[in-house]
Amino acid sequence: MRTNPTTSSSVVSTLEEKNLGRIAQIIGPVLDVVFPPGKMPNIYNALVVEGRDTVGQQINVTCEVQQLLGNNRVRAVAMSATDGLMRGMEVIDTGAPLSVPVGGATLGRIFNVLGEPVDNLGPVDTRTTSPIHRSAPAFIQLDTKLSIFETGIKVVDLLAPYRRGGKIGLFGGAGVGKTVLIMELINNIAKAHGGVSVFGGVGERTREGNDLYMEMKESGVINEKNIAESKVALVYGQMNEPPGARMRVGLTALTMAEYFRDVNEQDVLLFIDNIFRFVQAGSEVSALLGRMPSAVGYQPTLSTEMGSLQERITSTKEGSITSIQAVYVPADDLTDPAPATTFAHLDATTVLSRVLAAKGIYPAVDPLDSTSTMLQPRIVGEEHYETAQRVKQTSQRYKELQDIIAILGLDELSEEDRLTVARARKIERFLSQPFFVAEVFTGSPGKYVGLAETIRGFQLILSGELDGLPEQAFYLVGNIDEATAKAMNLEVESKLKK
C-alpha cells in the first residue's frame, strides 16, 4: 500500500528519472516497445504513451508489460484503444504495476480498469493507491474456520448457505432477478455485517452496467445526496473495451475489496459479472501474444490465471472477501474448460429458475438445483441439516407428483401425497421473501430473516402444525409469525366479504 496521486500522468511526473522507450510495432491492442540497454521494465509494469496524434488530439494510453522479447524489446497490452499511436512515439516506464485508488472514497463511484472515475462526479478524494498485482494471503494469515455467511435471505441461508470468505456461482438467464438478488445482498451485508461491496463488471454490456447503476441509485444502495453513505464501489470494463482492460478489471475490483478487508478489517462482498468474460479476455490476449492455444482454443495458462484471481478471494484474520460470480456456460456445456475451471473454485451455487420467476416467487432460487459444500451436519449443525434435507425431499416429491396432478388432478393422489403437496406448496411460497431494494417497486417493506427464525419456520410447516393455514398466507412474508398473522387477516377479510 502506498500513497501517491492516482492518475497515470502524475505518477510519471513524480518519478525522479524517467525510463523512456519508443514504440517499434503496433498490432491492434499490442505494442512492441524498445528500451535502452540495461533499462528493461519488469513484467506487469505499467507503461504510459503520451502525445498527440496526426490531427492534434491528445493521446494518453496505459499499457501493461506482458513479455520480454530480447534485443531490448518488450511486448505490452494496451488498457484502452490504440487509435492514433505511431511507431517512434515515446513510451514512459512508470517503474511499477498499475495502481488504483482504494478506501472509503471509492464507495458510490464508478471506475474503469485504471481506477479513473467515469461517472462525471469529479476526482476521487483519496491519495491512497494499491497495485492490482499482489500475492494471495500467506497460509498463516488465513482464517481456516468454516463459518456460515448469513445473508438474511431464507432460501439461501437454509438450502445453499454461503461460506464466509467463500466463492459462490450465480446461474441465471435474463429477467429472473439476478440484479435484484445482487442488490439485496449488497444491502444486507451493509446492514447486518457493517460490510461493503465491490461490483466488478467484467466484459458486460454497457446498457446492463448503466441499468445496475440507475437501479442502485433508485433503491438507495448508492446515495446520491450523501455519496459517503453508499454501500458499493463499481468497476466496469465493458464489452467494447480492449481485451487487456477486460482481463484486468477483475483485479482492479479485487484490489479495492482487499483494502476494505485488510486495512478496514471489514466483511466484503465482491461481485464479478461475468467470470467467463475474464477467461475470454485472457484467451484473446494470449492469442495476441502468440502463445500456442490449449483445449478448445483457450489460453494454455487458463488454470494459472483463474487461480491467481480466485486465491486472493479468501478470509483472513482481519476480515473476509465473499465473492459472488455470475457464470456464463457456453452452449450449456458444463465440460467447457472455462466453466469447468471456475467450478473447481466454487463453494456454493445459486441457480435462478425461470419457472419460479414465472410463478411470481422471488427470489426465484431453485431449491433443488442450488448446492453448497457448507450444508453438512458438522458445519451447520444437525437441526439445520435435517430441516434442509426434509425441505428438499418434500420439494422433490412434489416435483415428481406434478405430472400426475396435471393429468389426473389432486383427488387421485393418496392421502399422504396430498398432504406432501399441500406442505410443499406452503414451503415454495415461504421460500419467497420481500426485499428491501424492491420496496420502491412493490410497496411491501423488506424483511431480513435470521437463520434461527428461518429454521423454526420450516420446521413448523414440516411438522404439520400449520396445515390448517391457507398457502397464500406464506407468500412474500418474513418469518413464520408474519405468515400466521397474515392467515388471521385473510380469515377476517373473508368473513367480512361474506
Curated annotation (Swiss-Prot):
Keyword Cell cycle: no
A Gene Ontology cellular-component term: proton-transporting ATP synthase complex
Residues noted as binding ATP in the record, renumbered to the chain: 172-179
UniProt KW keywords: ATP synthesis, ATP-binding, CF(1), Chloroplast, Hydrogen ion transport, Ion transport, Membrane, Nucleotide-binding, Plastid, Thylakoid, Translocase, Transport
Classification via SMART domains: AAA
Principal subcellular localization: plastid
EC number(s) recorded for this UniProt protein: 7.1.2.2
One GO process term, biological-process aspect: proton motive force-driven mitochondrial ATP synthesis
Known partners and oligomeric status: F-type ATPases have 2 components, CF(1) - the catalytic core - and CF(0) - the membrane proton channel. CF(1) has five subunits: alpha(3), beta(3), gamma(1), delta(1), epsilon(1). CF(0) has four main subunits: a(1), b(1), b'(1) and c(9-12).
Protein name per the record: ATP synthase subunit beta, chloroplastic
Organism of provenance: Calamus usitatus (Palm tree)
Lineage, highest ranks first: Eukaryota, Viridiplantae, Streptophyta, Embryophyta, Tracheophyta
Gene that encodes the chain: atpB
